[in-house]
Amino acid sequence: MSAPIEHTDPVPSAAVLEPFGRSGRALMLGHVHPDADVLGTLLALGLALEARDWSVVYGGPHPAPALLAFLPGVDRYRRLDKLDGRFDVVVLTDCPNPQRTEGLIDQAKSAGKVVVNIDHHPDNRRYGDVNWVDPTAAATGEMMYELLMALRVALTPAIATNLFTAIHTDTGSFRYSNVTTRTFTIAAALVAAGARPELVSESLYERRAPDALHWLGEALARVEVSEDGRVGWLALPASAVPERIVESEELVNYPRSVASVRVACLLRELDGSVKVSLRGKGDVDVQRIAAQFGGGGHVNAAGCTVAGPLPEATQVVLAAVRRAVDRKGTS
């Protein structure tokens, strides 16, 4: 394609649909530490394309976490160091920054005829040949549902389960303010197509090993709240971070659950850097905080990675959070 295509409406345009009009070889490319929104959408689209005689490769810089092993087709998603062969289309979902592919995006642009970027983050870099970015979507799973409907895909229980899980997790089990009537309408259609909410919830929240509860207790003992009660945080050293990345990310919701807290932070020491997850309650834009450290996200949910040891990173991030909270308190 000569010039990048941009589309922001909830329903995909003809230009978004065009790369999927004929069969070929496709790459479903994920980002670092893939979560349920990226995995669910890539798997759903890949399964739909395979039903139309496409050859599909699934993978990214990191493998799928054990917590999401129940997703249909996830066993085919693998860690990729390099890309082999050519692709008619390369699809990235829920990935606002191409740097999150750890260099695989550069290989993809060389190996793929068309790079399709589908995302709901408002700060998406528009790095694809086709860029469909809809910040009004609660999850990229909503957008993928619309794409499959526009392509006249018959939803299977496997596809429906992947998309339902994507939406379920990105809305905090339908608890967050990003949930709309559209969210529930799509979720209902996915349940009608064979997704089972009780099995998704059980797989995500009720299959812990006994020692996981002990680890959870140790982690929660580290929760701190500022003197004024408006900032809550949890700083985890590398020795305390489990392999189940998705589950540990949910820890940020514990300080967020404190009534007085306006911004909650989870800081996890990983590979010599600190991964930061930020959550707000609507009155402080945590995306702006994350942007100060090269990150991004949404108004109420954002993240970034900060260099340096955990104590120093915690101090720097909390200072930025306090400034944001104080500005809001005086505005």
Ranges and model annotations:
Residues 118-186:
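Short alpha-helices
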Residues 79-81, 103-107, 131-134, 152-154, ...:
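A generic local secondary-structure boundary/capping motif
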Residues 36-42, 98-102:
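Short glycine/serine/threonine-rich phosphate/pyrophosphate-binding segments
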Residues 41-44, 72-74, 104-108, 130-133, ...:
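Short, glycine/charged-enriched secondary-structure capping and boundary segments
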Residues 2-32, 40-69, 84-87, 168-329:
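Hydrophobic helix-and-loop "lid/oligomerization" segment in the mid-to-C-terminal part
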Residues 48, 106-114, 150, 181:
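A glycine- and small-aliphatic-rich helix-loop capping segment at beta-alpha/alpha-beta transitions
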Residues 32, 36-38, 95, 120, ...:
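Generic detector of well-ordered alpha-helical packing
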Residues 72-74, 80-130:
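Active-site cofactor/cluster-binding pocket
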